[in-house]
Amino acid sequence: MLLMLGLMALITFIDRTNISVAAPEIGREFGFSKTQLGTIFAAFGFAYALGQIPGGWFSDTYGARKVLTIVVLFWSLMTMVTAHAVGFVSMVVIRFVFGIGEASAWPAATRSMQYWFPKSERGLVNGVTHSCGQFATTLVPIVAVAIMTMWGWRAVFYVFGAVGIVWAIVWYFVNRDRPEECRAVNAAELAYIEDRTVGEAKTEAPAAEKKIPWFLILTSKNMWFIALAYCGYTYGSYFFWYWMPTYLMEFHHISLVKMGALAPLPLFAGALGVLTGGFATDFVYKRTKTLKWSRRAVCIASMLGASALMLPSAFSGDPVLTVIFLALCNFLISMSLAPSWAAAMDVAGGFSGSVSSVMNMVGQAAGSVSAIIFGALVEHVSWLAPFYVISGVMLGSALLWAFLINPERLVIDRS
């Protein structure tokens, strides 16, 4: 299960970020401005954000097996269609539809994790799966540059799209929505997953709770604080996923090949950061038995550190030193990812797909805005201006985690 979810994470990030490596070539071929490129990057994010709540509902209603099979097939085909864009409007439309397809991926994966892993392992499981996604962004510059050198930028989308189609077919035949539906899972394993002793009856959710309580979810201050804090991660990460290759090539005047060698380093650091954050939040939880500080402490430290390092990254004139600062910054940003998703699962009760979809919707909307703002600031102010904004957003995230978020308070709790 963890292997398949990790591969899914890898595919989602490969397909959403491959355009960042192709962007300089696409921009030159079609004559796109920086603001137009930012809009193309953001088209995916806005669609991805809009599709989160429907994706969460589909996941909680129909299960991860069916939902992931359908959506991975769909977005993989849309990845291939990207190669047939003929201009700005068609590229925006294709990326928007592609984003709708990917929107159900993480709500469905989160639903699957909730059924298949105990509470004490949720941080690490989130860390492993999300680190696979981050590791994918490390591979993209290397593989995409090699493909582009041989066959051009359009071939990138054909190759990566085919990978997702293969995964969807395998997932449908090997996955089950719940561990009790899998004959390979014995009673002891099932009891461990459900945090109970062998022979103890499984606690069923009351009938009234089986209907998704959207009013309670959407009026939970705690849920909205988590969602807003998650914006610190997405706002910063969109720079690394979409703008960093162009920034290195145009601001530091390096070649496509050198960019392909340097860009993976901050992205690999991000993958390590996700794993570290997942391990750290579970380590603190197992020692303290408190969700409150196991989630908050990691996020506060990571966001404060990343905010402080973002500006030195911008002011370094040496591309290698810049990449080192960016690697440290992305490591810290990414440490907040696993505890953020674990917190969404913690407060969700039995509705993790729906709650996580709201959090991801808000976060991806913020990331989409950042892609446009970054391009506009570069075009009309300077390459340095957007780094101040990113640093400020991450500082705000740290303050939310420090003073307003309580991972132990359920969204349905109004006491």
Question: What residues fall within each predicted segment?
Answer:
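Conserved MFS/SLC helix-loop-helix module at the cytosolic interface between two early adjacent transmembrane helices
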Residues: 50-89
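Structural signature of the two symmetry-related core transmembrane helices
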Residues: 66-80, 292-311
